[in-house]
From Swiss-Prot:
Transmembrane segments: 2-22, 27-47, 56-76, 77-97, 109-129, 134-154, 179-199, 221-241, 251-271, 285-305, 311-330, 335-357, 380-400, 417-437, 476-496, 524-544
Enzyme Commission number(s) of this protein: 7.1.1.2
Family: Belongs to the complex I subunit 5 family.
Organism: Paramecium tetraurelia
Membrane-topology descriptor: Multi-pass membrane protein
Keywords: Electron transport, Membrane, Mitochondrion, Mitochondrion inner membrane, NAD, Respiratory chain, Translocase, Transmembrane, Transmembrane helix, Transport, Ubiquinone
BP terms from Gene Ontology: ATP synthesis coupled electron transport
GO cellular component annotations of the record: mitochondrial inner membrane
One Pfam family cited in the UniProt record for this chain: Proton_antipo_M
Name of the molecule in the record: NADH-ubiquinone oxidoreductase chain 5
Amino acid sequence: MFSFFFSFYALSVIFSLLFKHFLSSKGVFLLNTTSIGLFWAYSLSNLNLFFIKNKLIAIHLFRWFPLSAGYLVNFSFYIDTVAYSFTLLTLTIGVFVNLYTYSYFRYEPHISRLISLINAFIASMIILVNSGNLVVFFFGWELIGITSFFLINFWGERAPTFKSAFKAFSFNKFSDSAVLIALILIYANVHDLNFEAILNVSHLYSEMKLGSTPQINSWNLISFCLLFAAFVKSAQFGFHVWLPDSMEAPVPASALIHSATLVSAGVFLIMRFYPILELSLYFKLVTALVGALTALAGGLSAVFQTDLKKILAYSTISHCGFLIFLCSFGNFKLVIVYLFVHGFFKAISFLCVGNLIRFSKSYQDLRRMGSFFKYLPAEFFFLVFSLLNLSGLPFFFGFYSKTLLFMISDVLYFRDAIFCMILLSCITGLFYSFNILYYSFFDSKKARKSIYAGVISEYLRSYYYSNTTMASNIAIFLLIVSSCLLCAYLINFYLLSLSTATDFYLVYVKTFSFTLAPLSEAALLNYSFFYWIIAIFFVILVLFSYYQKKTTAEVSLAGFFDFFLGGFFF
């Protein structure tokens, strides 16, 4: 059944790309939304099959081409819990992004091309995460790169747009080259392309050396290439400069790129090739350090930004660092929980920000916004809910996922430095979330008269604005409901099945960690309470600063410490 729904969806995407001029925008929208909706409904029916029963399915669609004498490469799928998780996340966001796109760009001249490219991007990600062999994996890896280029370059007549698209494409070519080298070396060592064989027998070849240089372990070189590709694709520290520029893409495309597709492809690469990566001695240490450093750098950069979309872009870099950090632990259940929480609520944040930007007449600078609450109350509540989940405040899904970060940071080498970086990164999430909410919805002193002159009653009551805004808000609301249900399902089966944090420590940490120092189980219980204190302190700080004579509106966004001290002491 999976092959049927995927084939129907893929053919719908190809048909809409080839004949978009004959289908019209409504035809392209209905065809793609129907096919992805059916695919999503089928995926939802298999929740228990993969998340509880851990089912593994291998599907051979057709024979592709002969690689050598007697060896045929098949177009095949390898579906396990990891592949199903990424597929479900991508399809869930993709369904509502389609609805949002049609409402948001209904009167744009190139709406058919945008919807077709978005669905081609989704189909490319599904091919990648469900690939059954190395050739199909590389095919999907290349597809998400080329489709992301066309999405970022959607308004190619603008010079900055093409530069940003070419920059992202160039960086991704480095990751493509590294993946290609790694796949060739894997085939040279294992003499097989199928994931079923590679992942099961790779440990038997752990002592393989390169033929020309026998002093080099081939698996160390393979791990280096795979990690390099993952770090570039997931915008880790040093390779992150392409991601903020990708904000030139339309808002629905940005929601997909930053939540479920392009940046999460590097995370999937680590999870898929984990049996190979763990053969390297330094894999866990390097991954943990790079992830923690990226999370801190991305969070601090987001605090000092004034462009609304770039704040979310650097926030994505920070959360990608958290995901890479979790991958170093080796327990995929924890990565999947954090991936779902971040992916869903980051997509919701982008869709809400899209409505904000349209309302402000395409201004993205927070310094030119303010007092939008009375005009956009629905977007405010949607954005508050998503940002509180991303920040990890108590009583929200992000609180459970970020507690895992503190638990894991105490079982690694350099745990003091890593714990401090993770803690500071989580705190920065609270500050840039407050910046977005306060400076766009409540800061009336900073708002420009040009904005209010443009926001007139005729515009608010126009057929264009009222209908598109209502439809987009419905899409955002349905995505929130679906996200909450799926996140609650995952947290219930993956996290709350363990009665206490001490049970979590005994079952997972002592089994999978490589630390040599014994830790106190009682100390583990303090992390969540410690984060509670930080969160409550920040809420008091915000409330205190709001009612003071010296409001935060008079404090520059660039003065992070002035903002903090001004709100606390004045």
